[in-house]
């Protein structure tokens, strides 16, 4: 089964729980941040997963940023329109992810690791904020040859979405898709995903950037990019940062910076536009975890349908607004159709 949209990312099971500021402080964690932990390193933060499993209110939710985006795009496009690549373990966690994707209409092309468990992410919620602690597990072992085995799906795709978290796993796989996209004039969308990506994985990001025709990031990730790449502008000036990325790009590029409830900033060679976020009563906000993934899902659905940039961004904002009224990175069980 081929599909117009191919997504590459790190499939994870989210352990989601409400915690206190003191709990974050206990592990030196920050609100609205994302970090990686390694089970083999003896990192004290690995204890978080066991602690969350002991909490009766902890919810297990299918996650992984790009996988959330894939399900979001499928929510809009319908079944059979999205293929998702990533690596999982042979365990009950991956079965759960597979079932969630099937229900959402996403075709899962998992590379299965027999001896390594499926990755997991602790989503620690404080009010309307979240802090993510990720043990990549099997997600860390994706290899480009898995794409080769399913290259017919790549060739049939019309556009690609790459989760920036995958830069920590296989930049080679991203480049392989990027080269195909470039040679065949297909849109190639890259999400920065987290502030640590430009800082810690700067070389991998620099290697992949030339292939991206669209960049998506939030204000924290834009600031991190500005600092890591030493741009000569204020790290809070989203428009200036985006303009530098567009100016320095060897390909025509559109940069989209989301900023919570502040207007979305969009810069291309044609100029700068801002798109106000429609206000949502705070009493309706249930959970902001995955809001950025939902924005990307709605946006990618718009591109896949052939909508213009303005409509695609509106679809992203619309889907993000739906998602934050649900628990976890998910969407209403009853299908709601987009309308301007």
UniProtKB/Swiss-Prot annotation:
EC number: 2.7.1.20
Enzyme class: transferase
Superkingdom of origin: Eukaryota
Molecular functions per Gene Ontology: adenosine kinase activity; ATP binding
GO biological process: AMP salvage; purine nucleobase metabolic process; purine ribonucleoside salvage
Cofactor(s) the protein requires to work: Mg(2+)
Misc remark: Present with 22200 molecules/cell in log phase SD medium.
Function in brief: ATP dependent phosphorylation of adenosine and other related nucleoside analogs to monophosphate derivatives. ADO1 does not play a major role in adenine utilization in yeast. Its physiological role could primarily be to recycle adenosine produced by the methyl cycle.
Protein name: Adenosine kinase
């Amino acid at each position: 089964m081929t599909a117009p949209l191919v997504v590459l990312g790190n499939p994870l099971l989210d352990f989601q729980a409400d915690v206190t500021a003191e709990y974050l402080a206990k592990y030196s964690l920050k609100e609205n941040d994302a970090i990686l932990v390694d089970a083999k390193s003896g990192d004290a933060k690995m204890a978080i997963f066991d602690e969350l499993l002991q909490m009766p209110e902890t919810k297990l939710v299918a996650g992984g940023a790009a996988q959330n985006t894939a399900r979001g795009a499928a929510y809009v496009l319908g079944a059979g329109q999205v293929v998702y690549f990533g690596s999982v373990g042979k365990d009950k966690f991956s079965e759960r992810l597979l079932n969630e994707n099937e229900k959402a209409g996403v075709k899962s092309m998992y590379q299965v690791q027999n001896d390594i468990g499926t990755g997991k992410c602790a989503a620690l919620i404080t009010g309307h904020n979240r802090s993510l602690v990720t043990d990549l597990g099997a997600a860390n072992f994706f290899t480009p040859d898995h794409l080769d085995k399913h290259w017919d799906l790549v060739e049939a795709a019309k556009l690609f979405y790459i989760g920036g978290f995958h830069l920590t796993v296989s930049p080679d796989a991203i480049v392989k898709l990027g080269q195909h996209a470039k040679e065949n004039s297909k849109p190639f969308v890259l999400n920065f995903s987290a502030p640590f990506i430009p800082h810690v994985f700067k070389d991998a990001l620099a290697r992949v950037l030339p292939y991206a025709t669209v960049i998506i990031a939030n204000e924290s990730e834009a600031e991190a990019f500005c600092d890591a790449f030493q741009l000569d502008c204020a790290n809070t000036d989203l428009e200036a940062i985006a303009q530098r990325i567009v100016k320095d790009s060897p390909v025509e590029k559109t940069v989209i910076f989301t900023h919570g409830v502040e207007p979305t900033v969009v810069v291309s060679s044609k100029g700068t536009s801002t798109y106000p976020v429609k206000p949502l009563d705070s009493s309706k906000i249930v959970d902001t975890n995955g809001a950025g993934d939902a924005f990307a899902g709605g946006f990618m659905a718009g591109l896949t349908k052939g909508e213009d940039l303005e409509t695609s961004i509106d679809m992203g904002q619309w889907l993000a607004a739906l998602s934050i009224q649900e628990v976890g990175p998910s969407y209403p069980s009853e299908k709601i159709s987009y309308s301007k």
